Structures are given as structure tokens and as C-alpha cells.
Regions:
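OB-fold ssDNA-binding interfaces and closely related basic DNA-contact patches used
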Residues: 1-60, 69-76, 85, 98-102, ...
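Acidic, gly/ser/pro-rich intrinsically disordered tails
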Residues: 1-6, 12-21, 115-146
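OB-fold/S1-family single-stranded nucleic acid-binding modules
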Residues: 82, 87-137
Length: 146
């Protein structure tokens, strides 16, 4: 499994759903994730919660799936934490060049909560942007759309 770093930005919106809390956050992911072959529905487990930082609560977690792992950093409210499993759906990818001429890939994905050991189910709909697009190509973009 490859490892990537995902950084969640501060633009976090949350609302309650029948499964718990739905959190909408944009985040950035390295190009390694593009090389993985995604399935339409894939389970991930988020664990290894480590509080960090002084502004709000910054947490790190490990995102584990069949195809790849990610170390996630997020600044969230103190009660939004715990080990839980999500399905990932609706992955789309678009290649583009940023204002500095760097090749990037924008991804969108929907995470649906399955369970939470801390009693808080969290689902996320995220905007992902590749911040390190080494090795990224139209081919890998197509495979990520899968």
C-alpha cells in the first residue's frame, strides 16, 4: 500500500444526518493516491488519533483501505474524533495546470459512515487536490475515475 498525506483545510461545515454528523471539508492529497485503483465502494478505517497544535484541535489519523493508506491531518472540533469505517463512492478526477504552471489533479469523493467506536458516525464529502503531481498523467486520471 502506498502512503499519502492528506491535509484538511479550515473550511469545515457540519450538519446532522440519521447516521450522525456529516462533515464537508476540502483537502489535498499527494499524487500517490492517483496511482491506486479505486473501487466504486471501498472500506477505510480511520484510527491513530493524535491531538496536536494549539489552535483548535488538530488530529492525525491513518486511513486504511484495500488499495492505499493515508495519514490525515485535520483541525476539527474536540468532539469530532474516533475510530470509524467509511465507504468511498463517486470518485472523479480532473487534470489541470495551476497558476504557477504545476500539473495538478482535482479529485472529488464521497465517504459514507459505517460505524464509529466512539459513537460519532462521520461522513465526508471532500474536494481533493493533488499537491505533488509527479508521475500523474491522463492515464492515471482515467484509472482514478474507474
Amino acid at each position: 500500500m502506498s502512503k499519502v498525506t492528506i491535509t484538511l483545510e479550515d473550511d469545515v461545515r457540519a450538519r446532522k444526518t440519521k447516521n450522525g454528523i456529516l462533515i464537508d471539508v476540502p483537502f489535498f492529497v499527494s499524487a500517490d493516491v492517483i496511482k491506486a485503483e479505486f473501487k466504486e465502494s471501498e472500506e477505510f478505517t480511520i484510527d491513530d488519533i493524535i491531538p496536536d497544535g494549539v489552535e483548535g484541535r488538530r488530529i492525525h489519523w491513518k486511513l486504511s483501505g484495500d488499495k492505499w493508506n493515508a495519514l490525515v491531518k485535520a483541525k476539527l472540533a474536540p468532539t469530532w474524533y474516533g475510530k470509524f469505517t467509511c465507504d468511498i463512492h463517486d470518485i472523479k478526477a480532473n487534470a489541470f495546470t495551476d497558476k504557477d504552471g504545476n500539473d495538478r489533479i482535482a479529485l472529488t469523493a464521497t465517504f459514507r459512515p459505517i460505524k464509529s467506536e466512539e459513537g460519532v458516525a462521520i461522513g465526508t464529502t471532500n474536494e481533493l487536490e493533488v499537491i505533488d503531481a509527479r508521475g500523474a498523467s491522463e492515464e492515471s486520471t482515467d484509472s482514478a475515475e474507474g
